[in-house]
């Protein structure tokens, strides 16, 4: 298995001893986080709103939890319901990160960031990248958006929000429960109680049953309960522009599987569960690919996540395939969320 770049520290999620420097820095990080949060709570640092509803999707842990698939699905649902959503994102990993810009499906990933380009490509929605989420939200409103979805903005308190959706990894949860860098927490786990919805990413979970109602969790209850999200894959898209084919057509075959995401093993496991022989190649999250990265020494199909695929379009050939990922949640979750947003829209229009 190819492994390149930094990985999540093992001691975040197991019983490995925590290095002394990390143990010493964690209280400092926690204190700074608490002071900053308190300043906003007391009004000494001001929050600013926009004249449309704002939905923030984020997590209290560092690393990937499935926010991007949920963001794409939420934006698509909003479009189907008649909204004109806009997405505000930092655009992590892009060049010249301090420059705000519009992102569409054709924006180079180096300028827009892999996740914003993927969101624009999958949804066609207006996407604005800016380190200042408030400025991004204002630009989206001026562009005609009537609802803002803020991708990974839970800790960006300057932007006032109407709905917070926490996304948490169903297996790892909050790890060892310690603050960065001794553990994975950006904020104390208790912060999750203040969120309106919690979405638990079960990963593939092909045999799991998604409950029709929210499941409460002691001591970290979100306002509207906990909802389980399942990620599914059922097709592969040739990156040379040919028609998609069923994923099942690769069952029993060996493939190179590429993933430059926070938890690459999750993608590999999903392919294995479909009966595909996986030769895994894990890259760092937000890795910038070059054609030579795919010199694996054997001519097998190369399957990758869509987040990786948007970065490989300039040198794609007939051996490269993207695997579309779908986020599935209970119908009751969407009813609850969309009903709340409809009420918020009326409130904003009356303001």
Curated annotation (Swiss-Prot):
EC number: 2.7.1.130
The keyword Cytoplasm belongs to this UniProt entry's keyword annotation: no
Its biological purpose: Transfers the gamma-phosphate of ATP to the 4'-position of a tetraacyldisaccharide 1-phosphate intermediate (termed DS-1-P) to form tetraacyldisaccharide 1,4'-bis-phosphate (lipid IVA).
Record family assignment: Belongs to the LpxK family.
Annotated InterPro entries: LpxK, P-loop_NTPase
Pathway: Glycolipid biosynthesis; lipid IV(A) biosynthesis; lipid IV(A) from (3R)-3-hydroxytetradecanoyl-[acyl-carrier-protein] and UDP-N-acetyl-alpha-D-glucosamine: step 6/6
Catalytic activity of the protein: a lipid A disaccharide + ATP = a lipid IVA + ADP + H(+)
GO terms, biological process: lipid A biosynthetic process; lipopolysaccharide core region biosynthetic process
Name of protein: Tetraacyldisaccharide 4'-kinase
SUPFAM superfamilies hit by this protein: P-loop containing nucleoside triphosphate hydrolases
Any one GO CC term of the record: plasma membrane
GO MF assignments: ATP binding; tetraacyldisaccharide 4'-kinase activity
Organism superkingdom: Bacteria
Annotated PANTHER family: TETRAACYLDISACCHARIDE 4'-KINASE, TETRAACYLDISACCHARIDE 4'-KINASE, MITOCHONDRIAL-RELATED
Chain positions recorded as ATP binding sites: 61-68
Keywords: ATP-binding, Kinase, Lipid A biosynthesis, Lipid biosynthesis, Lipid metabolism, Nucleotide-binding, Transferase
Enzyme class: transferase
Keyword ATP-binding set for record: yes
